[in-house]
Amino acid sequence: MRLIERGSGTPRVAIVGGIHGDEPAGERIVERLLEELTVEDGVDEGTVQLVVANEPALAVGERFTETDLNRTFPGDVESDTYETALAARLTTVLEGADAILALHTSHSAPPPFAIYTHLSDTVRKTVTGMPVDYVVDVSSLRPTTLDSTLPNTISLETGRQGSEDAVEFGVEAARAFLRTHGILQDEEPTFTEKTVVSVEEEVPKGEGTPEVYYRNFEEIPKGEVFARDDVYTHRAPRDGLVPVLASEHGYEDIFGLYGRVAGTMEPEHS
């Protein structure tokens, strides 16, 4: 793990890239921010922690070395499994931060979107300050991710894995995050309403050639095929479902998630 701090005092916010080694955009976004936020200049107020999390996995371009880092929080510092011990170290570094942004990419088609588990005032502020239209509530899923473990944390899917667009958008979004929390004061932050999608269940994947027929947040009519392979043919079991993280090759065991539009998230004091 690599940690670089800029600025001093409060608030203290963190931007974390490289949780998965096959998502190099996060590391590149952190490197771009380091170029802009020099020791002498760049931070107007407070402290920003810039973290590259899983350096060994990034070095070999694999999602993880032993186990998925984002499935093992809060971790165990005594563990012999690399990512499990790393999760505990990362948790210690970030504990007490006023706001945390975790950067990710996926094999899904755009648009980028935010993810949260626990809706606090800080999470609302962060999300409504992001340049995205959608935010996904994953509170019904596993409690072993960074955003489910540390308060005031959101994850951000910046775009398609391996694309330059994901890097450029991630830098833009990271700047927006820093403006939202007063670290950057070069311009006023912008807060906008977001569409909230609540995740309901994972959609399993089997063997054979996978096919996905709907993009993220595109409503699937009841009974229509969302995805199939040699084992499964998934038809939407009820009305109102939309895919989240839908892809043919993004995950070994799922096509993505079924979600449902649950309303909107308004900026504070709107």
Question: What does each model-found stretch correspond to?
Answer:
Residues 1-270:
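Structured catalytic-domain cores with a bias toward divalent-metal coordination
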